[in-house]
Amino acid sequence: MLSLSKNWNTLIKPNKVAYENFPETNNKAKIVVEPLERGFGLTLGNAMRRVLLSSLQGAAITSIKIPAIEHEFSSIPGVKEDVSEVILNIKGIEVKMHVAEKRIMKLKATGPCVVKAGMIETGHDVEILNPDHVICDLAKDKQLEMELTCKVGKGYVLSTNSYEDNLPIGEIAIDALFNPVKSVTYKVENTRVGQVTDYDKLIMFVETNGDVLPEMAVGLAARILQEQLQLFISFEEQEEDKQVKTDALPFAPYLLKRVDELELSVRSANCLKNDNIIYIGDLVKRTESDMLRTPNFGRKSLNEIKEILAKFNLRFGMDVPDWPPENIQELSKRYEDSYN
């Protein structure tokens, strides 16, 4: 049971999450997560997509009230579209609420004009995210008045479910799409860790309506998944697994990382392996002169490794006290989480 209880520590864990917004808008983003165990790209990508499209909280218009109009199968004097078309257009209005309680907005317009979402009087607690969205066409000398109720919710709620709210006569319930995420797509590519090239890289494309940024939406979806899965953890970690003393070593735990986990060329990796350079600590203790005396190791390989070490503020010829430790294999595994 002890070995099984440590199973999750043997899997590679993602150590890089990159967010890239599209230049034309902050509502679209590309999210790259790597490296992942083979198969985990599809597992996480599908789970995140389903949560993003179904479980995030947002705001939407849930009902409207137009004077002298009692149902959606009516027509409004002076309005080109019938009530059903107007409702369909209203469903496309994207709103952001700064409070949890429902709010009633008002719309007043005089023709001739194209009535747009930006003409709605929202107050301080509600914001229209797509003010140019068209609601209807109003004829000359005609007036249109309307009350619109918006609420906070999640997912897609049919208008039939709104009848539970005991709407007054004349107030028409409409289908409400609360989710602030408009679209999510993902793909999985290969990525390299050391000499292994078939780990997964998860690439997600997320677009929101502006109520929440894509980065925040992804974070919220991950938190929802975390909370839902927490119940399945039916055991406790051993105390020694929880408390790893990172101050017990006279050198940085990262030096216990194996050099084959660095993204080296095959030639450089083989040279290090043939010279019995296994850990980063072994590598940084060597001088440049030592490395150039290694068989088949040239200036090109030297510069390649120097660039990689520089990314971690490391260099050749470093003084590493008490290196190598006697139980280096045990320490390398024990401090794995410290340098991941």
From Swiss-Prot:
GO MF annotation terms: DNA binding; DNA-directed RNA polymerase activity; protein dimerization activity
Stretches for region Alpha N-terminal domain (alpha-NTD): 1-236
CC annotations in GO: cytoplasm; DNA-directed RNA polymerase complex
EC number in record: 2.7.7.6
UniProt key word Acetylation: no
Chain intervals for the UniProt region annotation (Alpha C-terminal domain (alpha-CTD)): 251-340
Biological process, per Gene Ontology: DNA-templated transcription
Domain of life: Bacteria
CDD domains: RNAP_alpha_NTD
Reaction(s) the record says it catalyses: RNA(n) + a ribonucleoside 5'-triphosphate = RNA(n+1) + diphosphate
Keywords per UniProt: DNA-directed RNA polymerase, Nucleotidyltransferase, Transcription, Transferase
Top-tier EC class: transferase
Gene3D superfamilies for this protein: 5' to 3' exonuclease, C-terminal subdomain, DNA-directed RNA polymerase, insert domain, RNA polymerase, RBP11-like subunit
Stated family: Belongs to the RNA polymerase alpha chain family.
Quaternary structure and interacting proteins, as annotated: Homodimer. The RNAP catalytic core consists of 2 alpha, 1 beta, 1 beta' and 1 omega subunit. When a sigma factor is associated with the core the holoenzyme is formed, which can initiate transcription.
Function: DNA-dependent RNA polymerase catalyzes the transcription of DNA into RNA using the four ribonucleoside triphosphates as substrates.
Description of its domains: The N-terminal domain is essential for RNAP assembly and basal transcription, whereas the C-terminal domain is involved in interaction with transcriptional regulators and with upstream promoter elements.
Protein name (Swiss-Prot/TrEMBL): DNA-directed RNA polymerase subunit alpha
